[in-house]
């Protein structure tokens, strides 16, 4: 066998089924993340914000130092703030994505287990009990062995 080149090694690695499956999973996961982020930001959080007094969670922040504004109204120095609302939003996104992935994996596991149980070979049937004739013949054989 000759030496394999770097490109041949990379091609062999990249064409493995697991790597391709993982790449597809990453792409689908990225798209799924965007869908869930939109669901959280546009569907789930507005009613929750309404219930707690019309709060938009992404706007929640703690201003540690106010912005400095000049006499002409232009901002001289930006405000220093801790934007914890965006953190809350990202946390809700994560929890919902994690829960959705958990449900998906649980479904796949159940289907795989069910399919494996259906495909599992049945235990071989127990051999039938010997008939009366077979028992009698066995006893005769044993008696003949004893006489020898």
UniProtKB/Swiss-Prot annotation:
Native source species: Bacteroides thetaiotaomicron (strain ATCC 29148 / DSM 2079 / JCM 5827 / CCUG 10774 / NCTC 10582 / VPI-5482 / E50)
Stretch forming the signal peptide: none
Disulfide bridges in this chain: none
Record-level Gene Ontology MF annotations: mechanosensitive monoatomic ion channel activity
Transmembrane segments: 12-32, 85-105
Protein name listed in UniProt: Large-conductance mechanosensitive channel
Superkingdom of the source species: Bacteria
Main location: membrane
């Amino acid at each position: 066998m000759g030496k394999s080149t770097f490109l041949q090694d990379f091609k062999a690695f990249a064409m493995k089924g697991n790597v391709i499956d993982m790449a597809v999973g990453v792409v689908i996961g990225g798209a799924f993340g965007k869908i869930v982020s939109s669901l959280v930001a546009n569907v789930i959080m507005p009613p929750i914000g309404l219930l707690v007094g019309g709060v938009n969670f992404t706007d929640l922040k703690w201003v540690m130092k106010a912005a400095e504004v000049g006499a002409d109204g232009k901002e001289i120095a930006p405000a220093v703030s801790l934007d914890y609302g965006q953190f809350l939003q990202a946390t809700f996104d994560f929890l919902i994505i994690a829960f959705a992935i958990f449900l998906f994996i649980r479904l796949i596991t159940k289907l795989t287990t069910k399919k494996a149980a259906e495909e599992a070979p049945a235990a071989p049937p127990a051999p039938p009990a010997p008939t009366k004739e077979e028992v009698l013949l066995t006893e005769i054989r044993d008696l003949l062995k004893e006489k020898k």
